Amino acid sequence: YIDLLDINAEISLIGHSLGGIFLAKYLSENTFIRQIRALHLIAPVWSHPESILHNTGNFSFEAKNLKKISSQCDEIHIWASRDDDIVNFEDSEKYFEYLPKSEMHIFGHRGHFLQSHFVELFQTFL
């Protein structure tokens, strides 16, 4: 599907939960076809190869390789809620630590961001 992208359109990528770790792994190991305007990691699972709480499958990555992401993205947004009962809040803090040019958006009562409306995310596209 990447081949079908309009080469003149701005690209923003959004990964939620396991989708977040998928994008982190992909972008830390590969160079995307062009510059990414914004990367949004919403309640992303951190790479826990030893964890029984999260089966990250083949999505585990080397944290030191995350620096490759920063050069491919104009903006990096990490979205986390302190009351997330599926992914630990600390997972998002780890991404923030390893992605120094990222912006972290912290909420207190959004859980795992399963609501049908996410106005704050939408506003970043305006």
Task: Please place each PLM-identified region on the residue numbering.
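Short beta-strand/loop motif that positions the catalytic acidic residue
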Residues: 72, 77-80, 84
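Conserved alpha/beta-hydrolase "acid-adjacent" motif
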Residues: 85-91
